[in-house]
Curated annotation (Swiss-Prot):
The gene is Crk. Residues 60-85, 201-229 are annotated as: Disordered. This is Adapter molecule crk. The lineage of its organism: Eukaryota, Metazoa, Chordata, Craniata, Vertebrata. One of its GO terms (molecular function) is signaling adaptor activity. Residues 132-192, 235-296 form the SH3 domain. GO terms for cellular component: actin cytoskeleton; cytoplasm; membrane; neuromuscular junction; plasma membrane; protein-containing complex. Residues 67-82 have a biased composition (Pro residues). It comes from the Eukaryota. Keywords: Acetylation, Cell membrane, Cytoplasm, Membrane, Phosphoprotein, Proto-oncogene, Repeat, SH2 domain, SH3 domain.
Length: 304
């Protein structure tokens, strides 16, 4: 299913000058396909498409050739002798940002299409904290996690606290940007020296140290897939191969258990990223990031 946003509504997806760290703070933990567009801080005139996908935040550079267009571009024609700007992301070229966003509503970037812009309400919710305002804890014991929403850690790990929904269970982030619930009795409060904070907690999926808010962009950019369209179930059955094991909660009878290498018949594609399908004679829902779609033109090549 394609995204449910208006690509012509600039205010919903364009954030202007926003650092990579700020983008990660807004998108980390959001569902797959939530995104924003911002100005590149290292390449004036270019843009960056930041997207929550596959349990991390990916950043795709959008290069602009010629005069930079307004966002969204004005319908007025460029002056004589001035070539209209072209926007390039990976191997694809577009006349405008709305056209680019429309394309990735129905084509995969890496593991997701664009579903919806990140909510503006998160900007004022306190989600973006300067390093000196953040709260940290240090692990006293190893914790392997008991279910999918837990954050495993080792004794001595430094974690950043994001939220305290329960007295004995807090939401935290580790040095790789992974988030989850941690048991409070397993940790102690920790106050790092301000100069060493960036060495303790990473700010993006590449594992590089976070930069001050508004600082330069660390790490490389992701590259979108080449013309991977969202499949259409109306054209016939769609099959996928499991690439990540899934052990669902025992109390959720509608969830589908998956083993790496198994074949899944996809029966419904939901915009939330929770797909429905059949595997080993059972039906249920599963995260689409746990499977890889087979080549629908030559599916027999992947059935072995």
């Amino acid at each position: 299913m394609a995204g449910n946003f208006d690509s012509e509504e600039r205010s919903s997806w364009y954030w202007g000058r926003l650092s990579r760290q700020e983008a990660v703070a807004l998108l980390q933990g959001q569902r797959h396909g939530v995104f924003l567009v911002r100005d590149s801080s290292t390449s004036p005139g270019d843009y960056v498409l930041s997207v929550s996908e596959n349990s991390r935040v990916s950043h795709y550079i959008i290069n602009s050739s010629g005069p930079r267009p307004p966002v969204p571009p004005s319908p007025a024609q460029p002056p004589p002798g001035v070539s209209p700007s072209r926007l390039r992301i990976g191997d694809q070229e577009f006349d405008s940002l709305p056209a680019l966003l429309e394309f990735y509503k129905i084509h995969y970037l890496d593991t997701t299409t664009l579903i919806e812009p990140v909510a503006r309400s998160r900007q004022g919710s306190g989600v973006i904290l300067r390093q000196e305002e953040a709260e940290y804890v240090r692990a006293l014991f190893d914790f392997n996690g008991n279910d999918e929403e837990d954050l495993p850690f080792k004794k001595g790990d430094i974690l950043r606290i994001r939220d305290k929904p329960e007295e004995q269970w807090w939401n935290a982030e580790d040095s790789e940007g992974k988030r989850g619930m941690i048991p409070v009795p397993y940790v102690e409060k920790y106050r790092p020296a301000s100069a060493s904070v960036s060495a303790l907690i990473g700010g993006n999926q590449e594992g590089s140290h976070p930069q001050p808010l508004g600082g330069p962009e660390p790490g490389p950019y992701a590259q979108p897939s080449v013309n991977t369209p969202l499949p259409n179930l109306q054209n016939g059955p769609i099959y996928a191969r499991v690439i990540q094991k899934r052990v669902p909660n025992a109390y959720d009878k509608t969830a589908l258990a998956l083993e790496v290498g198994e074949l899944v018949k996809v029966t419904k594609i939901n915009v939330s990223g929770q797909w429905e399908g059949e595997c080993n004679g059972k039906r249920g829902h599963f995260p689409f990031t746990h499977v890889r779609l087979l080549d629908q033109q030559n599916p027999d090549e992947d059935f072995s």
